[in-house]
């Protein structure tokens, strides 16, 4: 069992904040007149793993519907559901065979309609995961495309002759290992796949493809969907001349040469598609969230569009690669805010090792989980949570190659163990299978569910779950946290991340000790237009900070968080 930091310093939250309960809201705009998504809290659900309603071991839409009360009480405004469309499940749904239906393992369109309606009744809207780069090889479009060289859909995908007999058109590699070109013996050509061979890339240079895909989004908007998370947007285009990518030293987990994806990743034409998708979204007030892996803030900024006509919410996935460090986080947050755009903060998702494992030091993981929550839920911008982060769920990586379900883990073992570990079933209680199912769960549940589960944490005022609930209640309640500018404080402090969220009428101080040592800090906010008068504690996990009257000198215990209104 982890050391419960909060046993030493119990959770303190003002009664004003505790009394706040998030209610349904107008999804065209928030209370401040901004687009509804700007101040919303998003929550990613991996549908296989959230809740199983029919006890077949696989989560489903009715399972999600059964947990809307929980999500509403947590403070969630929108749920992003990973792909639930019909699929052969080669890549667990990221190989779509029909964009306008629901896979029967998850339910039916009627189940989706019920979920969407119930969600709105709970003040929660639905975001779907749109796989824009490729389809399944079982999609009717591709079945027709590969039927002959002269059929109407041949040019909907990337078909090319080889350089020579038994030689692919160029040296491009699949991100999941091996050549990115698959030979088709029926038509004697290769087709291109950035991912698995069963995931052929669409030809976005063909106007018929873009029209069809824009049409898919409209079909779902009319059904009540509030937006899309766009999968793998970087890889939509390839160099038409098929230039070889530069080869780099060394080999990857699959034994292939390392390579710079210079000619098949992040080509400028991607932004034209983002604009087209945005034009389809705007009439419905829908939001577009991008899976945007970028090397720097400048590249991330490009995805908003020069005229803010592309993605409203390109994800800052750079954050997931940073070390747990006050100084490193400060530098990155500062760079993002200097860009002038509205950030989208992500610390975990279905493709990334859980934040508990990435940021934790093996000794203070629970404390660090609270620090991370305090940071990304109080920053300027929109947060996207990942299911289970709020209870301290941990990776449960396979111990043996024969236990691996994710194909990239089977192919890349042991250097690449796959993504099974971050996709385990949600831990609802301490009964067998964590209350997820009475059947056999599709993915093993870690033994830590006996400690980290919703039912037990709801009873513990010092739990990670109640910490998240308090933070989200405060975030929804306080105008400075919703709307205020971000002002970095004490920028030379290597241990304490501190900043001000400030509007014209209000200022909130956030101070997070990211070290395992006591830290003494002082704040002079006069130059920020805040007199050194009253301070009112809003939220802390250090009991002796509850009633302090001044912030000129504050002692923060290891991993302590202090959030206060300052005047």
Give the positions of each predicted feature:
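Bacterial N-terminal signal peptides that target proteins for export
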Residues: 1-9
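Bacterial N-terminal signal peptides
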Residues: 9-17
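Acidic/aromatic-lined carbohydrate-recognition and catalytic surfaces
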Residues: 27-218, 222, 235-295, 426
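Loop/helix patches that line or flank the sugar-binding groove of alpha-linked glycan CAZymes
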Residues: 37, 241, 245-263, 271-281, ...
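Beta-strand-rich binding/interaction modules
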Residues: 518-542
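C-terminal beta-strand-rich structural cap/linker in extracellular carbohydrate-active enzymes
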Residues: 548-567
């Amino acid at each position: 069992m982890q050391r419960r930091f909060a046993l030493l310093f119990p959770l303190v939250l003002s009664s004003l904040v505790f009394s706040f309960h998030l209610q349904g809201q107008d999804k065209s705009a928030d209370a401040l007149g901004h687009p509804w998504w700007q101040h919303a809290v998003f929550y990613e659900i991996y549908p296989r793993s959230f809740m199983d309603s029919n006890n077949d071991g696989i989560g489903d839409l009715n399972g999600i519907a059964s947990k809307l009360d929980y999500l509403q009480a947590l403070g969630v405004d929108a749920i992003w559901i990973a792909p639930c469309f019909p699929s052969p499940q080669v890549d667990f749904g990221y190989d779509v065979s029909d964009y306008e239906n629901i896979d029967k393992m998850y339910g039916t369109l009627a189940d989706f309609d019920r979920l969407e309606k119930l969600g709105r009744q709970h003040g929660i809207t639905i975001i779907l995961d749109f796989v824009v780069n490729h389809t399944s090889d079982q999609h009717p479009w591709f079945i027709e495309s590969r039927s002959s060289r002269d059929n109407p859909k041949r040019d909907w995908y990337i078909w090319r002759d080889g350089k020579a007999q038994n030689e692919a058109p160029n040296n491009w590699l699949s991100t999941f290992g091996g050549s990115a070109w698959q030979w088709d013996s029926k038509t004697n050509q290769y087709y291109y796949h950035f991912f698995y061979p069963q995931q052929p890339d669409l030809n976005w240079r063909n106007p018929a493809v873009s029209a069809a895909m824009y049409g898919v989004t409209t079909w779902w908007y009319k059904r009540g969907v509030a937006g899309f998370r766009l999968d793998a947007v970087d890889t939509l285009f390839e160099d038409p001349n098929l230039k070889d990518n530069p080869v780099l030293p060394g080999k990857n987990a699959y034994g292939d040469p390392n390579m710079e994806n210079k000619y098949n990743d992040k080509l400028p034409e991607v932004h034209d598609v983002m604009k087209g998708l945005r034009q389809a979204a705007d009439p419905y007030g829908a939001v577009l969230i991008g899976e945007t892996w970028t090397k720097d803030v400048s590249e991330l900024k490009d995805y908003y569009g020069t005229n803010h006509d592309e993605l409203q919410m390109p994800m800052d996935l750079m954050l997931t690669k940073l070390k747990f460090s006050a100084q490193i986080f400060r530098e990155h947050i500062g760079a993002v805010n200097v860009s002038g755009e509205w950030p989208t903060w992500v610390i975990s998702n279905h493709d990334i090792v859980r934040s508990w494992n990435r940021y934790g030091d093996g000794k203070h993981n629970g404390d660090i989980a609270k620090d991370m929550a305090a940071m990304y839920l109080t920053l300027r911008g929109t947060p996207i949570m990942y299911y289970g982060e709020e209870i301290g769920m941990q990776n449960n990586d396979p111990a043996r190659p024969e236990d691996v379900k994710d194909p990239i883990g089977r192919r890349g073992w042991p250097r690449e163990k796959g993504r099974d570990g971050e996709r385990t079933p949600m831990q609802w209680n301490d009964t067998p299978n964590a209350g997820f199912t009475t059947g056999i769960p599709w993915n093993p549940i870690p033994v830590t569910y006996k400690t980290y589960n919703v039912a037990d944490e709801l009873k513990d005022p010092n739990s990670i779950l109640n910490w998240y609930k308090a933070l989200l209640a405060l975030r929804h309640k306080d105008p400075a946290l919703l709307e205020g500018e971000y002002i970095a404080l004490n920028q030379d402090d290597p241990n304490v991340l501190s900043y001000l969220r400030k509007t014209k009428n209000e200022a909130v101080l956030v101070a997070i000790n990211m070290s395992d040592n006591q830290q003494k800090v002082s704040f002079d906010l006069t130059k920020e237009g805040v007199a050194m008068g009253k301070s009112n504690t809003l939220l802390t996990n250090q009991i002796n900070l509850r009633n302090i009257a001044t912030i000129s000198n504050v002692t923060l215990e290891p991993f302590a968080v202090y959030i206060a209104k300052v005047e």
